[in-house]
């Protein structure tokens, strides 16, 4: 099993914004791949840093990948298709310069065509031309081998056909698999967030992921997978936007469990499309490690059970049944040892609550009585002195 993880673009934590600086940060995090984004355009000034990144990837055995333009119209009219192919040509040249192993592309809207065989044949025809073009670029000129040493082995980048996230876009899982099955040199790019959204939240358990990868393996007979993963907000079978993994109903834990428990045959590159990029890539690494630890703990328990069963001359299944019985007995004993608090009758409770109320009423009555006690009768001398300063209310009218 081989699983390489990395972000889609330069890490957010990278102080510099060049690809080489991003690669340094990714390698320092222990990640093994990245996907360079050329989603809108490839400018000539970019090729210098692309070449530097390609040299670093070649020396460090680091897997580089590239994402072509998002807005392709491969099913549009001839003008739209030629514009899209011009952008794809720039992405292919960048892939050669950067030593990319995969080039991810979209087909775009259906245009005037509808879903079905005709649209799939049109897409397949275009991708056959793209595959031939990447081969020509890779084997263009032997004189440039000293500058691009990774071209010597003669293995061009794979052309990836990505699953789309919306119903109006070509790229359902079945459409992608049909095209890839008929075009040599292409691979399916399983955008798991898109597949989850188009399936109305279909990827929820490790069994769901198992069915997905088995479907791909049985259809095109591959063990190599190139996947994107991210959280996603979706409605009515359409992906709205990417989210961080923890804020989505698309959980990574079931995929990690599938990779460890049943994915020993996988050769997978897994790209984090999350807005958190390398942070969620590290989150995926941690979940895979946790799944691996759980597997080791389970195997250790099974080995111990087999050893005890052999000593007791019984089967491991019988030993497991005994362990369950012992655990249940211990749970019952623990419940029995817990002394429940005595339950008092309602009348006693009412009596207890009434007594404090009576005490409070008695205290209130005492305070009222004390307030009502007449003050000490003043002496005649004190009354006369008080009269000296007594002022009737009517005197205020004088002023």
Predicted regions and their residues:
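Hydrophobic faces of well-ordered beta-strands that scaffold small-molecule active sites
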Residues: 3-9, 34-36, 64-68, 103-105, ...
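Active-site beta-loop-alpha junctions enriched in small/polar residues
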Residues: 8-12, 37-41, 69-71, 108-110, ...
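Gly/Pro-rich active-site loop or hairpin
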Residues: 16, 114-117, 170-173, 196-267
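Acidic (Asp/Glu)-rich catalytic clusters
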Residues: 23-28, 45-65, 93-97, 132-135, ...
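Active-site acidic/histidine proton-transfer and metal-coordination neighborhood
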Residues: 59, 74-189
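Flexible, acidic glycine-rich loops studded with aromatic residues
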Residues: 264-268, 273-278, 293, 302-305
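C-terminal helical cap(s) of enzyme catalytic domains, especially alpha/beta-barrels
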Residues: 278-291
């Amino acid at each position: 099993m081989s699983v390489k993880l990395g972000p889609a673009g330069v890490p957010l934590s990278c102080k510099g914004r060049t690809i080489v600086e991003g690669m340094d940060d990714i390698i320092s995090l222990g990640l093994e791949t990245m996907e360079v984004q050329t989603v809108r355009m490839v400018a000539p000034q970019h090729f210098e840093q692309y070449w530097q990144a390609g040299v670093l990837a070649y020396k460090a055995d680091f897997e580089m990948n590239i994402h072509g333009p998002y807005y392709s119209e491969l099913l549009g009219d001839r003008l739209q298709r030629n514009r899209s192919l011009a952008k794809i040509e720039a992405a292919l040249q960048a892939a050669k310069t950067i030593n990319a192993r995969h080039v991810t592309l979209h087909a775009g809207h259906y245009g005037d065509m509808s879903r079905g065989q005709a649209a799939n044949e049109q897409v397949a025809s275009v991708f056959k031309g793209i595959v031939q073009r990447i081969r020509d670029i890779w084997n263009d000129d032997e004189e440039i081998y000293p500058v691009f040493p990774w071209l010597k082995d003669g293995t061009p980048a794979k052309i990836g056909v990505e699953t789309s996230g919306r119903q109006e876009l070509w790229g359902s899982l079945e459409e992608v698999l049909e095209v890839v099955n008929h075009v040599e040199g292409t691979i399916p790019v399983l955008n798991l967030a898109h597949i989850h959204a188009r399936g109305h939240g279909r990827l929820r358990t490790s069994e769901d992921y198992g069915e997905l990868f088995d479907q791909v393996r049985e259809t095109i007979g591959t063990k190599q997978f190139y996947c994107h993963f991210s959280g996603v907000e979706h409605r009515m079978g359409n992906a709205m936007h990417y989210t961080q993994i923890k804020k989505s109903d698309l959980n990574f834990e079931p995929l990690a469990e599938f990779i460890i428990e049943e994915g020993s045959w996988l050769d997978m590159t897994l790209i984090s499309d999350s807005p958190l990029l390398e942070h969620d890539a590290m989150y995926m690494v941690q979940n895979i490690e946790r799944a691996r630890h759980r597997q080791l703990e389970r195997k250790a328990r099974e080995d111990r059970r087999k050893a005890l069963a052999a000593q007791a001359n019984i089967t491991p299944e019988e030993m497991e049944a005994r362990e369950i019985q012992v655990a249940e007995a211990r749970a019952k004993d623990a419940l029995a040892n817990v002394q429940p608090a005595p339950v008092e009758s309602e009348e006693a409770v009412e009596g207890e609550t009434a007594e404090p109320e009576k005490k409070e009423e008695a205290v209130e009555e005492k305070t009222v009585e004390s307030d009502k006690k007449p003050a000490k009768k003043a002496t005649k001398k004190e009354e006369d002195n008080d009269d000296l300063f007594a002022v009737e209310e009517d005197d205020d009218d004088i002023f």
